[in-house]
């Protein structure tokens, strides 16, 4: 019975991956290269902003620790 459970789990994951791959390929066909370029530019700006905010968060946290220690 245990092997049947593993088999059905594998089939379910395989079906899910196949379905996700199909929809991903459909998305790739609908977006033009110029749209992908715009998505890339916007994505890089978003990741840059997230990096800046993460750095700012940790710098503030570090400053609070230094102030608590009296440095």
Curated annotation (Swiss-Prot):
The keyword Ligase does not apply. Disulfide bonds: none annotated. Belongs to the lambda phage S protein family. GO terms for molecular function: pore-forming activity. It comes from Escherichia coli (strain K12). GO terms for biological process: viral release from host cell by cytolysis. Encoded by the cryptic lambdoid prophage DLP12. Keywords: Cytolysis, Host cell lysis by virus, Viral release from host cell. InterPro entries: Lysis_S. This is Prophage lysis protein S homolog EssD. The keyword Electron transport does not apply.
